[in-house]
């Protein structure tokens, strides 16, 4: 019984706020579940690409043009490195400063940038540079994220690269202008070279898959809101 000097509890504002909050939190949780399914399918596709037999550059290019995800597609081709135009990208090597070595190559009518792997800083001027036609095997990488917020500007003239800019790299390569620019970087497989340096990394995706954790968080907040609202009601 409510005494004359007491005000009735304001139930409806709490109910309305709870319903609105639950709708938002459940929607966000459901969206993360959908994103989880999409990300798992994408990662499965990348794994299938990496496990499939290698194809030549033109076949991989046509796959991408037809709408297939060509990331991590394995390629094998014969190409000739332009060793006087190698590029260095600031990187790390075994917890210390290192470099990623990129070498332009001409192959099958394409101008290709090949990621040959990493080396420690002290080996920058002393690494293997194979001459003549080479059997090259690697995986395709789009590297399309562009310049990060804190990344310095690339310096092609000073051969100092901080982020991936494939058109600029091909332009700086000095390869013949009649070669078609290949729209992917070819990352060498460790099994494709016997050189000590540069040393290729095992190809792996840098795609994060945190959607399950996010979904649990949103649904957990929805349950918490429901419990708190029930306590006050």
What are these regions (language model features)?
Residues 1-233:
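Surface-exposed, charge/polar-rich loops and edge strands
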């Amino acid at each position: 019984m409510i005494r004359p000097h007491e005000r009735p509890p304001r139930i409806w504002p709490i109910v309305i706020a709870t319903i609105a909050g639950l709708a938002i939190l459940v929607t966000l949780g459901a969206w993360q579940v959908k994103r989880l399914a999409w990300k798992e399918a994408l990662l499965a596709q990348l794994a299938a690409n990496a496990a499939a037999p290698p194809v030549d550059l033109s076949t991989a290019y046509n796959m991408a043009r037809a709408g297939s995800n060509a990331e991590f597609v394995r390629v094998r081709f014969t190409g000739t490195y332009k060793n006087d135009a190698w590029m260095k990208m600031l990187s790390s090597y075994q917890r210390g400063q290192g470099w990623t070595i990129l070498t332009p190559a001409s192959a099958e009518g394409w101008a290709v940038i090949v990621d040959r792997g990493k080396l420690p800083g002290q080996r920058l001027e002393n690494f293997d540079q194979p001459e003549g036609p080479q059997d090259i095997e690697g995986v395709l990488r789009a590297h399309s994220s562009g310049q990060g917020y804190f990344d310095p500007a690339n310096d092609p003239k000073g051969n100092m690269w901080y982020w991936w800019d494939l058109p600029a790299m091909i332009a700086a390569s000095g390869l013949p202008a009649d070669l078609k620019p290949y729209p992917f970087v070819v990352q060498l497989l460790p099994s494709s070279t016997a050189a000590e340096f540069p040393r290729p990394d095992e190809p792996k995706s840098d795609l994060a898959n945190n959607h399950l954790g996010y979904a649990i968080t949103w649904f957990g907040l929805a349950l918490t809101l429901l419990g708190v609202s029930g306590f006050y009601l």
